[in-house]
């Protein structure tokens, strides 16, 4: 993935109008930003361009306004948080194209920053409409994409626009692509993948792609129950997609053919109620009581997974190993995450993780900062794991 241009290749930015596509889709409550993580992550790139004398023009989407203005999806309420995190004033453009945008941009001086209104206020954004992309391009000299989280969508501000102007990856995009290259495209082997979460149905493509690329694949969470069921084990009242038993068997057969070792739970923490601190016991997976649910992996499974991580040089993680939001069913996820973090800190493992639940689980384990890279891009990270091309990245690569 290194065949794309970065800010290092952009030349002098003094006086240049830089269209910077960012992801500002932050959670809001009562008109206030409740989690500024995505804003904080783009601040260094904004500062770098502004400090070099570039005129920073921020493009972003927010919510799903269906191609026309909707006050509840305005980017304006984000302005104060953005300005505060940036430590400098940020102007606002009432539209992202047309006269309102052009006049606001014309007033910028070198080093100024402006946020333009929601790109999704125009139907042309999600349709990847060439005319809308041209209208966006008219306001810039160069284009920088800093929104990996939107890279799996072929929209005008992520794909068509990148083909109309000299296009570069921002620092966040660059870090994400470098991490993903180390994770699967050119990894240090052996590679281990941990895939958890509730359902096999949402991760069939991902599992089929991974068995061909990794040396060891740990399957945990609710989805492991479907595989255990496919092997003829009784999983009691556990979450289980019994209709996908044949799919599970197919994935197991493909893994065998590709010499990928599948690691399934050998024991489980079971309970009869789905609630925190429910009465529980650890049992072998072939002795799950008929009235109980599997809610986490057991101690022997944790030891097996930790042992596999000891052998690996690269780890790719998506999805928790159990119902981590309920104590004590977070034990497996926390123990394995902390073990991977220790190996990473000791320089023995490159660890890449992503997906909403995964980020929350790692933060819960207190190791969100200790992995080599944690991707905040849910859908784009999953599509990359599935081996799909990401339009926003391909558009940058085309110019690389």
From Swiss-Prot:
Residue positions binding ATP: 203, 325, 355-358
Keyword Nucleotide-binding assigned: yes
GO BP of this protein: gluconeogenesis; glycolytic process
InterPro entries: Phosphoglycerate_kinase (IPR001576), Phosphoglycerate_kinase_CS (IPR015911), Phosphoglycerate_kinase_N (IPR015824), Phosphoglycerate_kinase_sf (IPR036043)
Protein name listed in UniProt: Phosphoglycerate kinase
Known pathway: Carbohydrate degradation; glycolysis; pyruvate from D-glyceraldehyde 3-phosphate: step 2/5
Entry annotated with the keyword Nucleus: no
A single GO cellular-component term on record: cytosol
Similarity comment text for this entry: Belongs to the phosphoglycerate kinase family.
Gene Ontology molecular function: ADP binding; ATP binding; phosphoglycerate kinase activity
């Amino acid at each position: 993935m290194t065949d794309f241009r970065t800010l290092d290749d952009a030349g002098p930015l003094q006086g240049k109008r830089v269209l910077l596509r960012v992801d500002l889709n932050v959670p809001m409550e009562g008109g206030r930003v409740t989690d500024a993580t995505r804003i904080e992550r783009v601040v260094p790139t904004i500062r770098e361009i502004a400090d070099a004398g570039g005129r920073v023009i921020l493009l972003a989407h927010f919510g799903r306004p269906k191609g026309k203005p909707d006050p509840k999806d305005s980017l304006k309420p984000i302005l104060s948080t953005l300005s505060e995190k940036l430590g400098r004033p940020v102007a606002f453009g009432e539209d992202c194209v047309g006269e309102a945008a052009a006049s606001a941009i014309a007033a910028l001086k070198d080093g100024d920053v402006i946020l333009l209104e929601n790109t999704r206020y125009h139907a042309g954004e999600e349709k990847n409409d060439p005319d809308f992309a041209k209208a966006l391009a008219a306001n810039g000299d160069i284009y920088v994409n800093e929104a990996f989280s939107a890279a799996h969508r072929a929209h005008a501000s992520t794909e068509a626009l990148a083909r109309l102007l000299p296009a570069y990856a921002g620092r966040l995009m660059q870090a994400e692509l470098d991490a993903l290259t180390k994770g699967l495209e050119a990894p240090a082997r052996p590679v281990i993948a941990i895939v958890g979460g509730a359902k096999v149905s949402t991760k069939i493509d991902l599992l089929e792609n991974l068995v061909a690329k990794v040396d060891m694949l740990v399957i945990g969470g609710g989805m492991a129950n479907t595989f255990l069921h496919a092997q003829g084990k009784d999983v009691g009242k556990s979450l289980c997609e019994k209709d996908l038993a044949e799919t599970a068997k197919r994935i197991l057969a493909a893994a065998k053919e590709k010499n990928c070792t599948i690691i399934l739970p050998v024991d489980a923490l079971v309970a009869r109620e789905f609630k925190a601190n429910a009465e529980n016991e650890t049992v072998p997976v072939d002795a799950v009581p008929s009235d109980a649910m599997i809610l986490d992996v057991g101690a022997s499974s944790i030891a097996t997974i930790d042992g596999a991580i000891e052998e690996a040089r690269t780890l790719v993680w998506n999805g928790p190993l159990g119902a981590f939001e309920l104590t004590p069913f977070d034990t497996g996820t926390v123990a394995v995450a902390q073990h991977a973090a220790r190996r990473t800190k000791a320089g023995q493992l490159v660890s890449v993780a992503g997906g909403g639940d995964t980020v929350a689980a790692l933060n819960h384990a207190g190791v969100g900062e200790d992995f080599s890279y944690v991707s905040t891009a849910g859908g784009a990270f999953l599509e990359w794991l599935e081996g799909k091309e990401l339009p926003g990245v391909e558009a940058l690569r085309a110019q690389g």
